[in-house]
A protein has these predicted regions:
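A cross-kingdom marker for long, charged
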Residues: 8, 228-270
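Acidic/histidine-rich, surface-exposed loop or edge segments in extracytoplasmic proteins
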Residues: 16-33, 116-124, 229-235
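Von Willebrand factor
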Residues: 1-15, 18-153, 157-160
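A short, charged/proline- and glycine-enriched loop
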Residues: 12-23, 153, 222-227
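N-terminal post-signal-peptidase region of extra-cytosolic proteins
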Residues: 39-48, 139-143, 208-213
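VWA/integrin I-like adhesion module and closely mimicked acidic/polar interface patches used
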Residues: 165-242
Length: 270
């Protein structure tokens, strides 16, 4: 490709093709500690981002917070510009037929500075949220045309950075992740300690089952899709049973709604 004729100058994306889209959703509904921020930054920004994302693939950052999914806007959504150097991606090299190395290097530096600005302002002051709409955000980006994350992209990767403790009016894992012993305590003292199975949740909560069946993505929405979860280990999840059973709960839900290409990467305890 030639930058001058084939690339949109405002977002660095190809004019004629949708090559790929990496959408990074980060859950800010629980408080973050510095080790968690450092771990996540090292995976979704900087050299890790550039070395894992081919040139001219779109990169988008979306925050999960108290904002309803349909009202949330991308923090950033542009394509990864070519480095102008030899990498494992053929498209990173300067096209000597129509490009100069200084020209490409100047644009790359501009693009890189924009990504650095996003990184520096991305992690807000800690605030607990009243709800955690992880599932709702997941369904939103797969279903809605406005998210620009459709199967018309040749490849799609959805990266979810979260502690996975989903709690909303319709999908409440916090309620489902308390043992019988925990439920005997006064309500204000109850904490999540162990999750029941997804199958049990479907049988026990008919409204939950109906909601999942009504909102789960269809086959077209799942084409060319890979999902990666960076599983944040928040302080209250140091209980081993909770950490393991919560991961199992999400794996079973992914399978139920049709997501087969997924990977859950747990944060190492700190």
């Amino acid at each position: 490709k030639c930058v001058n004729s084939d690339v949109n100058k405002s977002d660095y994306c190809p004019l004629e093709a949708k090559l790929g889209h990496t959408l990074i959703m980060v859950d800010f509904t629980s408080r973050w500690e510095k080790p968690q921020i450092d771990w996540v930054k090292g995976r979704i920004f900087g050299d890790a981002l550039i070395s894992s994302t081919p040139p001219y693939h779109r990169i988008s950052y979306l925050k999960i917070d108290n904002t309803p999914p349909h009202s949330q806007k991308y923090v950033y959504s542009k394509c990864r510009f070519k480095t102008g150097t030899k990498t494992r991606f053929e498209g990173d090299k300067v096209n000597s037929k129509c490009e100069g190395s200084d020209f490409i290097n100047t644009i790359y530096k501009t693009w890189r500075s924009q990504i650095n600005e996003v990184e520096n302002s991305f992690f807000p002051k800690n605030e607990d949220a009243e709800q955690s709409l992880i599932y709702e955000y997941l369904v939103h980006v797969l279903r809605e045309y406005s998210a620009d994350f459709g199967s018309n992209y040749q490849s799609r990767e959805l990266i979810i950075v979260s502690d996975l403790m989903q709690y909303s009016e319709r999908v409440n894992f916090f309620k489902h992740c308390k043992s019988a012993a925990e439920l005997l305590k006064p309500k204000k003292q109850q904490k999540a300690d162990k999750c029941g199975s997804f199958e049990k949740l479907l049988k026990k909560e008919k409204s939950f089952a109906n909601y999942i069946n009504a909102t789960k993505p269809n086959n077209e929405m799942l084409k060319n899709l890979n999902v990666k979860v960076l599983f944040i280990n928040h302080g209250y999840q140091t209980r081993k049973d909770l950490y393991i059973t919560l991961q199992d709960l999400w794996e079973d839900m992914f399978k139920y709604i049709g997501i087969s290409n997924y990977e859950i990467v747990p944060q190492i305890d700190f």
